[in-house]
Amino acid sequence: MKRNRFFNTSAAIAISIALNTFFCSMQTIAAEPEETYLDFRKETIYFLFLDRFSDGDPSNNAGFNSATYDPNNLKKYTGGDLRGLINKLPYLKSLGVTSIWITPPIDNVNNTDAAGNTGYHGYWGRDYFRIDEHFGNLDDFKELTSLMHSPDYNMKLVLDYAPNHSNANDENEFGALYRDGVFITDYPTNVAANTGWYHHNGGVTNWNDFFQVKNHNLFNLSDLNQSNTDVYQYLLDGSKFWIDAGVDAIRIDAIKHMDKSFIQKWTSDIYDYSKSIGREGFFFFGEWFGASANTTTGVDGNAIDYANTSGSALLDFGFRDTLERVLVGRSGNTMKTLNSYLIKRQTVFTSDDWQVVFMDNHDMARIGTALRSNATTFGPGNNETGGSQSEAFAQKRIDLGLVATMTVRGIPAIYYGTEHYAANFTSNSFGQVGSDPYNREKMPGFDTESEAFSIIKTLGDLRKSSPAIQNGTYTELWVNDDILVFERRSGNDIVIVALNRGEANTINVKNIAVPNGVYPSLIGNNSVSVANKRTTLTLMQNEAVVIRSQSDDAENPTVQSINFTCNNGYTISGQSVYIIGNIPQLGGWDLTKAVKISPTQYPQWSASLELPSDLNVEWKCVKRNETNPTANVEWQSGANNQFNSNDTQTTNGSF
């Protein structure tokens, strides 16, 4: 018997409704097997650099060129490998993370560039069908995924994949590309401007021109032409190669620099392939540097459309930027700013609980650096003054940021070393303090005693079991410049979170839906006493409190978040899937007022709506033209779907 499949609207995984002629001609639909559904909202992701994490096999350190290795030079390979990661799986299990995102393990260029840099990071690929010799071999990779999938670990592996480009076009290997060791082409040889393997349009000179951003070289990296059928097949087959080796999800590098129609087609084909081998629910999330709920115009304004319709979620850089400004205490950025962003992202992202939220990453200085330094340049787009705080104070602020990251709507990603408060104050060649490569330092250690480690473990465990944290509603309960108290809720599962970046303060909070009682905080030593839906809460500076209730006696909400899913929603060009029903929120059976939903994992479409409590609902799935409501109409057959909003959080229909 098939398990019922469900992604809520809060999913940012979407697929094209209007694919271009080439992509339509290539689409195939796989037969649906018995499969196990994967919902990544239950996951806590840990992002690590393979080369920087742990050296488990010193024999591969030099690779094919000893000049590429120097354990004391962060521009070069420093020794980390797959064997080292295998050896440290017990550590990661104890940390409570459930998914490991690794930098691309594919074969990279074998030489240093003119500035002495190497491909240790994995983003200068030359062969998408081989593992780089510095990291081990395919047997090592399969051993890693087999162990991760075993009952001892029950972890997922996220592959960082770079379909936008290969390697530099003007030095080193000049864009050379191979398939399992067989040479295909390089940038100088393949000179057809827009019909060959590469675009030959030069580098991006106008970052406000979206065509350039997508079709010119990103700096000097050879820009792949994904509309070429051979290129598409190479990238698709490369993805399947890694899925066959055990990959569970893909982080798409530089999604901003590729056409949406390619992303839609590729993610759809990979999703179908994953289903065909019995692994439904393959997850994608992309790197769009500058993606933010606050940015709705210009090139970066397109990020919201990609998040809602491309087939891939995004890393929420807007959340990261807002959180850093609030924690550092930059002028005008308060807990009210953070609360406003959390509310806004629910309105612009169709699927905000599927976007990936994070505090640290590899492209700008770590939060610990920004908190402690008085510099003004920390990385691309991050030219604001640091906090000049003490190490101890900075660590408390990092703890606060971790609690926020782990409890807001979205899938949390923790950058390696954050659990040890990693920070670096070295300036790179661009004058950026603590940025590339100094935010990619060797793993500082593997002890398990820090408060940050404890927070990640505790809240990671909470995420595994709590529907409220996985996909529940977000409601602000109390906020001022320094304190934010909010509720996450799904049915009778309620989590209350309080964050204080200011001086010690006592506040009175009302509208707390949990039953009367005393609730110990899941982190720290505080507790919350609730009586008649109110509490008086004392918070120390930089303190966080997290409580949970699962009582059937919880105060009934005035609204319920209901997740609608329509399965088997195959569409033609210009057609989308809608939900329609007997209540005003569903259009009152008026096709012109039906609610358009998102293709969460095509051909599955989902939406999340807030409806009044104790409401009897009848509804159906319907396909119709996006601009002409009476064209291309196809109704779900059979009886209406029915439910009462007090009785369920999920409801499903199918064509």
From Swiss-Prot:
<dbReference type="Pfam" id="PF02806">
    <property type="entry name" value="Alpha-amylase_C"/>
</dbReference>
<dbReference type="Pfam" id="PF00686">
    <property type="entry name" value="CBM_20"/>
</dbReference>
<feature type="binding site">
    <location>
        <position position="362"/>
    </location>
    <ligand>
        <name>substrate</name>
    </ligand>
</feature>
<feature type="binding site">
    <location>
        <position position="440"/>
    </location>
    <ligand>
        <name>substrate</name>
    </ligand>
</feature>
<feature type="binding site">
    <location>
        <position position="251"/>
    </location>
    <ligand>
        <name>substrate</name>
    </ligand>
</feature>
<feature type="signal peptide">
    <location>
        <begin position="1"/>
        <end position="30"/>
    </location>
</feature>
<feature type="binding site">
    <location>
        <position position="436"/>
    </location>
    <ligand>
        <name>substrate</name>
    </ligand>
</feature>
<feature type="binding site">
    <location>
        <begin position="123"/>
        <end position="124"/>
    </location>
    <ligand>
        <name>substrate</name>
    </ligand>
</feature>
<feature type="binding site">
    <location>
        <begin position="217"/>
        <end position="220"/>
    </location>
    <ligand>
        <name>substrate</name>
    </ligand>
</feature>
<feature type="binding site">
    <location>
        <begin position="256"/>
        <end position="257"/>
    </location>
    <ligand>
        <name>substrate</name>
    </ligand>
</feature>
<feature type="binding site">
    <location>
        <position position="164"/>
    </location>
    <ligand>
        <name>Ca(2+) 2</name>
    </ligand>
</feature>
<dbReference type="InterPro" id="IPR006047">
    <property type="entry name" value="Glyco_hydro_13_cat_dom"/>
</dbReference>
<dbReference type="InterPro" id="IPR017853">
    <property type="entry name" value="Glycoside_hydrolase_SF"/>
</dbReference>
<dbReference type="GO" id="GO:2001070">
    <property type="term" value="F:starch binding"/>
</dbReference>
<dbReference type="InterPro" id="IPR013780">
    <property type="entry name" value="Glyco_hydro_b"/>
</dbReference>
<feature type="binding site">
    <location>
        <position position="79"/>
    </location>
    <ligand>
        <name>Ca(2+) 1</name>
    </ligand>
</feature>
<keyword id="KW-0732">Signal</keyword>
<feature type="binding site">
    <location>
        <position position="257"/>
    </location>
    <ligand>
        <name>Ca(2+) 2</name>
    </ligand>
</feature>
<feature type="binding site">
    <location>
        <position position="223"/>
    </location>
    <ligand>
        <name>Ca(2+) 2</name>
    </ligand>
</feature>
<feature type="binding site">
    <location>
        <position position="81"/>
    </location>
    <ligand>
        <name>Ca(2+) 1</name>
    </ligand>
</feature>
<dbReference type="InterPro" id="IPR031319">
    <property type="entry name" value="A-amylase_C"/>
</dbReference>
<dbReference type="InterPro" id="IPR013783">
    <property type="entry name" value="Ig-like_fold"/>
</dbReference>
<feature type="region of interest" description="Disordered">
    <location>
        <begin position="630"/>
        <end position="655"/>
    </location>
</feature>
<feature type="binding site">
    <location>
        <position position="165"/>
    </location>
    <ligand>
        <name>substrate</name>
    </ligand>
</feature>
<protein>
    <recommendedName>
        <fullName>Cyclomaltodextrin glucanotransferase</fullName>
        <ecNumber>2.4.1.19</ecNumber>
    </recommendedName>
</protein>
<dbReference type="GO" id="GO:0043895">
    <property type="term" value="F:cyclomaltodextrin glucanotransferase activity"/>
</dbReference>
<feature type="active site" description="Proton donor">
    <location>
        <position position="287"/>
    </location>
</feature>
<feature type="site" description="Transition state stabilizer">
    <location>
        <position position="363"/>
    </location>
</feature>
<dbReference type="InterPro" id="IPR006048">
    <property type="entry name" value="A-amylase/branching_C"/>
</dbReference>
<keyword id="KW-0106">Calcium</keyword>
<feature type="binding site">
    <location>
        <position position="61"/>
    </location>
    <ligand>
        <name>Ca(2+) 1</name>
    </ligand>
</feature>
<feature type="binding site">
    <location>
        <position position="55"/>
    </location>
    <ligand>
        <name>Ca(2+) 1</name>
    </ligand>
</feature>
<dbReference type="InterPro" id="IPR013784">
    <property type="entry name" value="Carb-bd-like_fold"/>
</dbReference>
<dbReference type="Pfam" id="PF00128">
    <property type="entry name" value="Alpha-amylase"/>
</dbReference>
<keyword id="KW-0328">Glycosyltransferase</keyword>
<feature type="domain" description="CBM20">
    <location>
        <begin position="554"/>
        <end position="655"/>
    </location>
</feature>
<keyword id="KW-0808">Transferase</keyword>
<keyword id="KW-0479">Metal-binding</keyword>
<dbReference type="GO" id="GO:0046872">
    <property type="term" value="F:metal ion binding"/>
</dbReference>
<dbReference type="InterPro" id="IPR002044">
    <property type="entry name" value="CBM20"/>
</dbReference>
<dbReference type="GO" id="GO:0005975">
    <property type="term" value="P:carbohydrate metabolic process"/>
</dbReference>
<feature type="active site" description="Nucleophile">
    <location>
        <position position="253"/>
    </location>
</feature>
